[in-house]
Amino acid sequence: MISKTLYQKIYDSHIVYQDKNGGAILYIDLHLLHEVTSPQAFDALRSKKREVRQSKKTFATMDHNVSTTIQNISASGSMARKQMEQLIKNCQEFNIPLYDINNPNQGIVHVIAPEKGMTLPGMTIVCGDSHTSTHGAFGALAFGIGTSEVEHVLATQTLKQKRFKNMKIEIIGKIPKFVTAKDIILFVIGQLGSSSGTGYVIEFCGNIIKNMSMEERMTVCNMAIEMXAKSGLIAPXXITYKYLKDKIYSPSGLFWEKSLDYWKCLKSDKNAYFDKCITVDISNLAPQITWGTNPDQVISIDEKIPDYNNINSEVKKDSAKSACKYMGLKSNTYLTNISIDKVFIGSXTNARIEDLRSAAKILQNRKIAKHVKAIVVPGSGLVKKKAEQEGLDKIFIDSGFEWRLPGCSMXLGMNKDRLNFGERXXSHSNRNFEGRQGRGGRTH
């Protein structure tokens, strides 16, 4: 029997049709939708008089555009309202389950699907959103797709996909105090570069990954796309099964036992071939923070901003110089000396209950600076409810934060939560691109 990687096992088990050029049509187990990338796909279905092939394997929520201050689809502007109205109409017409803003479970799609047990090991999962790689934390092959592909999956429950190369990143060592999963993946991206994963599906492994919680694993896989990888994967283990047990959409009874038998096979074979293998020791790692305008422009909190004049690559030198200009920063200075205007705790990367607990622990009995506007946006209604039951909302409010409703919020500038021109934010989100959180906004 040929040894296979985890990626190869999932890919091969979902092939509906194999073409002679090495590409394949894959069956899709779960299709996630939101209000921004789906309207045109539904319009195309209507124009071609097609139905949704598997509405029971399709799920929708509102997250990108929603207001986090009031439950009202008109609160984020006319375009946002139109997109949300279209999602309601489309889901009703095609019989697709929807968590709208009035549903107590509404929230970020990449938070909801795992916490409800929709995301399961061995699945193929797609969504019209680049951070779909989050679901790879469960040993699922998950990736973002474009609007035309959204239409294709709606119509056929399949998708044409080429076979990507395999990369293994083994993270080893001992986690230093105050270092989080976000620090670890930012460090990896900083060491390898924001294009290092191009053409690959990355499997993360090693003792550090093995000992991570599911929510920490989701943070790591969420950021795989920031290395330009197609997807990120972590093999399921006992912690995965424990997380999924008794979730609403998880298998139950005899089906649970059968599922467990299958899930336990979902790991790379001992002699499986990887096109690239990298080992990263994080034993001496300090908390990380980005200084530039892409995630690989990152340093330890106690380091100085690099001197771009010392960078050998002309491309990287120009990029660093441009980033410093946009960010209003100078080489050889410390970010700890730079004042911020806003703080955002939230996003598909870091808006789960463990993230909020960690932040609340730091903020307890402390006050933020008076000039700083800070918001906490839970990733879902369930996360919000749990946090309030634990009193975390009171800790945040007492420290000076605003406690908001679930949504993507400042992870992207598609709603009213954004940076004004020239404002600087410390953000829990996944991207620090120019204008990502608002035109002229500066994100760390």
UniProtKB/Swiss-Prot annotation:
The keyword DNA-binding does not apply. Gene3D superfamilies: Aconitase, domain 3. Its EC number is 4.2.1.33. Pathway: Amino-acid biosynthesis; L-leucine biosynthesis; L-leucine from 3-methyl-2-oxobutanoate: step 2/4. CDD domains: IPMI. One of its GO terms (biological process) is L-leucine biosynthetic process. Residues 423-444 are annotated as: Disordered. Its cofactor is [4Fe-4S] cluster. Keywords: 4Fe-4S, Amino-acid biosynthesis, Branched-chain amino acid biosynthesis, Iron, Iron-sulfur, Leucine biosynthesis, Lyase, Metal-binding, Plasmid. It comes from the Bacteria. It catalyses: (2R,3S)-3-isopropylmalate = (2S)-2-isopropylmalate. Binds 1 [4Fe-4S] cluster per subunit. Belongs to the aconitase/IPM isomerase family. LeuC type 1 subfamily. This is 3-isopropylmalate dehydratase large subunit.
